[in-house]
A protein has these predicted regions:
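An intracellular "coupling" helix at the cytosolic face of ABC transporter transmembrane type-1 domains
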Residues: 10-14, 77, 99-103, 119-132, ...
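Short intracellular "coupling" helices and adjacent cytoplasmic loop segments at the cytosolic face
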Residues: 47-48, 83, 91-115, 119-121, ...
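Helix-loop-helix
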Residues: 48-55, 144, 148-162, 232-306, ...
Length: 577
């Protein structure tokens, strides 16, 4: 087991130690039982001594009961240790992921992280639980059984001494052959989960375009590939059982031959032969047990590599040693900023952007699809780090801020609006968990959400289903805006967050912004010119570069892109009227 993963055992160390100790006592009782059986056969039955048989029989029953007791207790402690270890490991990974930047998450993919925290950890849990019990049991059983066999027959002990390493080496060879295939299997599980996640999230789109058959075919393709990979791995592992069975029967036949010859010549008792055969079965059974655990360890080994990869991942963004812990105002400067999602050497999404947004200004951003509008604003709360240049908030490079302090003063309403399971109160309080009901209602009024919320039978106590699928797109956007406002940020960013809202409501939201939060810097990305027409400053982006900056009137005179969008939308509105 990887040392890094073992750090997650923590408070379950005691159970992890007690379980093998109980297993040792269980094995000790099991090893002594055949010796008592031999005495009953060779002395009690041979001499017809009923009293001796009863006496030794009672001892044998007591040993069996003690073995059962120790075994049950060992199983209980192993189960507690395994489940507790898995719980800690899930927590450790989950806490680690919370520190990941978008770039870190992109590296693993959402479905990949979900697979690691579910399937992979379950595999490790099973392997750990079996290891602290069965891997402790097998070596002790093999050693003690061999020692007991040595006291009964040197030839039989020598036979075991030859068989054990040969068989162990064979099993190890099989394990090494199968391991790479299991790694491929779990990598492909990510694709399988991704397919399911994508289909479930886009269920409405799939049905709207009648693409069920296509999605079924896509899922079947990934599922079939997982099946083929797993089958290949299992075909290799399947050699374990036949090899073990062959060795077991071969050893028993040789023992019967050696023992039978000894009984005929008078050098071995019948009870001793019986005990040796039982010890042989115990040894081979222990090796079969090891084989079974090896299969689990092989599967867990692939999972371990994937878990360690997450735990070893260095968060892209970390607080500096002397981090700035307060944001004075909403002044923003982009100083020769270039950015690539692939890092240095990658294709630039933003190219040499220079921009100054004064605190309290309302700034509109417009541009075609792929012009890097969202990319630009995501650099402000440091969701990504610039590739070149710097982004400054209140005159300080964002990389010098404490991340929590910076993001606490920058509220973003992303393109994809997310609501969580819970009441409307619960969702809005993501902006400030200590907010009063009155504060929640006030920000909803600003976001023009209070009206429709009060129309619900349960008002602000209305339950939102996962993803917010029981409210409309426009309602969802307004609730997300209210949530962002509750933080009382220095900077508010709306990334195309009023696209599902009618123009009248959109205008009311902007009016509320001007009147109620004049000192907050407001950055609005929009496709509708009407949403940003009255902004203090409008930025036109094209292919990751600033094509124009100015007011709406200035850009109509100087920027062809803005003029074209403006004219087409105004003309479209007139034609519609």
């Amino acid at each position: 087991m990887n040392k890094k993963l073992l750090q997650s055992v923590r408070e379950y160390k005691k159970q992890s130690i007690i379980a093998p100790l109980l297993v040792t006592l269980e094995v000790l009782m099991e090893v002594l039982i055949p010796l008592e059986m031999a005495k009953i056969i060779d002395i009690g039955i041979a001499e017809g001594n009923l009293g001796y048989i009863i006496q030794r029989g009672l001892i044998l029953v007591i040993m069996a009961m003690m073995s059962l007791f120790f075994g049950v207790q060992a199983g209980n402690f192993a189960a507690i240790a395994g489940a507790g270890y898995a719980k800690n490991l899930r927590h450790d990974i989950y806490y680690k992921v919370q520190d990941f930047s978008f770039k870190n998450i992109d590296h693993f993919s959402t479905s990949g992280l979900v697979t690691r925290m579910t399937t992979d950890i379950t595999n490790i849990q099973m392997a750990y639980m079996m290891s602290i019990r069965l891997l402790a049991r097998a070596p002790i059983m093999i050693i003690l059984s061999w020692v007991m066999t040595l006291t009964l027959s040197r030839k039989a002990a020598l036979l075991f001494l030859i068989v054990i390493p040969v068989l162990g080496g064979t099993l190890l060879f099989i394990a090494k052959k199968a391991h790479p295939h299991f790694i491929k299997v779990f990598d492909e599980y990510d694709e399988l989960n991704n397919s399911v996640q994508e289909n479930v999230n886009a269920a409405r789109v799939v049905k709207a375009f009648v693409r069920e058959d296509y999605e079924i075919g896509k899922f079947h393709g990934v599922s079939k590939y997982v099946y083929q990979l797993f089958t290949t791995a299992e075909k290799i592992v399947a050699w374990n059982s036949p090899v073990m069975q062959f060795v077991m029967y071969a050893v028993i036949m040789i023992l019967i031959y050696i023992g039978g010859k000894g009984i005929v010549t008078g050098t071995m008792e019948t009870g001793a032969l019986t005990s040796i055969i039982v010890y042989a079965l115990q040894i081979i059974g222990s090796l079969m047990m090891v084989t079974f655990v090896f299969v689990m360890i092989m599967i867990a080994g692939a999972s371990t590599d994937r878990i360690v990869e997450v735990l070893n991942e260095i968060p892209e963004m970390r607080d500096p040693a002397d981090a700035v812990t307060s944001v004075a105002d909403g002044d923003i400067i982009f100083d020769h900023v270039s950015f690539s999602y692939a890092g240095e050497g990658g294709n630039l999404s933003l190219k040499d952007v220079n921009l100054h947004i004064k605190s309290g200004q309302t700034v509109g951003i417009i541009g075609g699809t792929g012009s890097a509008k969202s990319t630009l604003v995501q650099l402000i709360p440091r969701l990504y780090d610039v590739t070149e240049g710097s982004v400054k908030v209140s005159g300080i490079d964002v990389r010098k801020y404490n991340l929590e302090a910076l993001r606490d003063q920058v509220s973003m309403v992303l393109q994809k609006n997310i609501l969580f399971s819970g009441t409307i109160y619960d969702n809005i309080r993501w902006g400030n968990e200590n907010a009063t009901d009155e504060e929640v209602q006030n920000v909803c009024k600003l976001a023009q959400a209070d009206g429709f919320v009060r129309e619900f039978p349960d008002g602000y106590n209305t339950q939102i289903v996962q993803g917010g699928n029981n409210v409309s797109g426009g309602q969802k956007q307004r609730l997300c805006i209210a949530r962002a406002l509750l933080k009382k940020p220095k900077i508010l960013i709306l990334d195309d967050s009023t696209s599902a809202v009618d123009t009248k409501t959109d205008a009311l939201i902007r009016k509320a912004f001007r009147e109620e939060i004049p000192n907050t810097t407001k950055i609005i990305i929009a496709q509708r010119v009407s949403s940003i027409e009255d902004a203090d400053l409008i930025i036109v982006l094209e292919n990751g570069e600033i094509s124009g900056i100015g007011t709406s009137e200035e850009l109509l005179k100087t920027n062809a892109i803005y003029r074209e969008v403006y004219v087409s939308q105004v003309k479209g509105d007139e034609d519609h009227e």
